[in-house]
Amino acid sequence: MALTVEEKAQIVNEYKQAEGDTGSPEVQVALLTANINKLQDHFKANGKDHHSRRGLIRMVNQRRKLLDYLKGKDTTRYSTLIGRLGLRR
């Protein structure tokens, strides 16, 4: 269910702000979004897995906090990120 090393590296390379950047809000939100999407697929087959659902809710909350932080710091970066990730339809 977790992202592979290759998937993480690809996401980091796609969303990084500078070389070696793994902690920027953009990278963190992109990684959380990928994990959330994988867990949503998991729940289609395993609807009664409530322990993993708790982890999913925690990830969604963490992503929300990071997006709120980014929106307060730089709205253009926020708008670009949600557009690239396909959030906020």
Curated annotation (Swiss-Prot):
InterPro entries documented for this protein: Ribosomal_uS15, Ribosomal_uS15_bac-type, uS15_NS1_RNA-bd_sf
Record-linked Gene3D superfamilies: 6.10.250.3130, S15/NS1, RNA-binding (1.10.287.10)
Residues in coiled coil: none
One Gene Ontology term from the biological process aspect of the record: translation
Keyword Cytoplasm on entry: no
Pfam annotation, one family: Ribosomal_S15
Keyword RNA-binding: yes
Disulfide partners: none
GO cellular component entries: cytosolic small ribosomal subunit
Domain of life where this protein originates: Bacteria
GO terms, molecular function: rRNA binding; structural constituent of ribosome
Family (UniProt): Belongs to the universal ribosomal protein uS15 family.
NCBIfam families cross-referenced by the UniProt entry: S15_bact
Role this protein plays: One of the primary rRNA binding proteins, it binds directly to 16S rRNA where it helps nucleate assembly of the platform of the 30S subunit by binding and bridging several RNA helices of the 16S rRNA.
Subunit structure: Part of the 30S ribosomal subunit. Forms a bridge to the 50S subunit in the 70S ribosome, contacting the 23S rRNA.
Name the record gives this protein: Small ribosomal subunit protein uS15
